[in-house]
């Protein structure tokens, strides 16, 4: 299960799960700035890392993104952990693309 980095109030009426792009982690300058700005509006922002980025953090070695299947499974794990009732998902670049793909899959599943 991914580790979360959370900005904004736990009691917020809406939570945004925000995924990083292919080349930078969840705590990059861009992600910090965007998450902080969104949290200032009263939205809870929850960031996480895909497995390859977590491994990069632990080993210091760059590696390519995981296969699409793993990225989508990670998104499903995040959604299950956070609950979907008041959850919006998105991300930067690759993270946003995976968010839109998993959203389409979940919608088709009902």
Segments and roles (model prediction):
Residues 1-87, 101-105:
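Serine-hydrolase catalytic machinery in alpha/beta-hydrolase-like enzymes
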Residues 91-95, 99:
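Gly/Ala-rich beta-loop-alpha elbow adjacent to hydrolase catalytic centers
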